[in-house]
Amino acid sequence: NTRSMQKELLSKETSERWRILYCNSLKNYMAHACVDGLLALLTDSSESEKLKTCLLEALAWFTHSYRKPDILRVCDQLRKDKSLSENLREEAGRTYYRLKN
């Protein structure tokens, strides 16, 4: 069930391994309705870099989403945020440019 997967991805109670698995499934089952939760996850400093990187990779597949402007806005903020790791900023930049072009 797609809704169940989305709920598990957004839940901090779910193990990171499963959250990453659900995150990868977003490439095939784009969950436009839960983009707000996904973007909140990206900006949550308590979430792991590994999970955020995986989520950015998945969001790069949302090229035709009606939520693309929101994803672009957050990716732009992340790629410019010097307090984040270089790896995370680069992934945010890749997602940003893939969606923008």
Predicted feature locations:
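Short, surface-exposed loop/turn motifs that are enriched in glycine and acidic residues
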Residues: K12, N24-N28, S45
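Short inter-helical turns and helix N-cap capping residues of alpha-solenoid HEAT/ARM repeat scaffolds
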Residues: E13-S15, S46-S48, S83-S85
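Amphipathic alpha-helical scaffolding segments comprising HEAT/armadillo-like alpha-solenoid repeats
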Residues: N1-L10, A31-T43, S65-K80, N101
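Structural detector for internal amphipathic alpha-helices that build alpha-solenoid repeat scaffolds
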Residues: K7, R17-A31, A40, K50-Y66, ...
